[in-house]
């Protein structure tokens, strides 16, 4: 479960993500529950190609009240993945 976001915000996030052929997982403080109102939303992107440059402007223009940061699964360090893997929440 992603914490600290409204159902309207989640709908905006899902609407943007559903246009891409990829899997998306939230992680970080908004999953763990140790977030503040100023916390960003961290999203791990699993895709056959790097779609992050396409995602960023869509979220920058989405009027969400927080920053959304993306991490490409194909380029992350194994140690970092091991730190976050138990906290991954798929965004469907």
Regions found by a protein language model. Give the residues of each.
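Catalytic core of pol beta-like nucleotidyltransferases
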Residues: 1-26, 31-38, 46-92
